[in-house]
Amino acid sequence: EMSASLVGSEMCIRDRFSVNISKPGVTKGQHWHHTKWEFFIVVSGKALIQQRRIDTDEVLNFEVSGDKIEAVHMLPGYTHNIINLSDTCDLVTLMWANEAFDPNCPDTYFLPVE
């Protein structure tokens, strides 16, 4: 019984984590969420994470690197992206969301940051 409970918890946690690999110069994201929030943690490479509240023009820029691990919080109502700043190296990012992706209610809306 305890084992089944642990497996259920692990499944829930695993569904909310993803590892994303971006080629040099690639921008990913350009979307926002109504309720979902996320953490982006670059574990290898260098990136620019940008966020903008959807009702403003002010862009928040976070330069991050796998050399100094830190989490950047993506808030609901903020369009966001992540840009691989390298010309030669892949960017590896660990992403966590507070809720698992639901294809029937994706809560993901395209909107460029800039």
Which positions does each model-derived feature cover?
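Single conserved hydrophobic/aromatic residue that forms the stacking wall/gate
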Residues: 1-13
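Structural motif
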Residues: 10, 46-48, 68
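Conserved short histidine dyad/triad with adjacent acidic residue
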Residues: 18-36
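Short histidine-centered beta-strand/loop micro-motifs
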Residues: 28-34, 41, 62-64, 83-85
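Short beta-strand His + acidic residue motifs that chelate non-heme Fe in jelly-roll/DSBH
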Residues: 29-31, 49-50, 71-74, 80-87
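Glycine- and acidic-residue-biased ligand/ion/polar-headgroup-sensing regions
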Residues: 35-52
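Short acidic-glycine-tyrosine-enriched beta hairpin
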Residues: 54-76
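Double-stranded beta-helix
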Residues: 56-58, 83-114
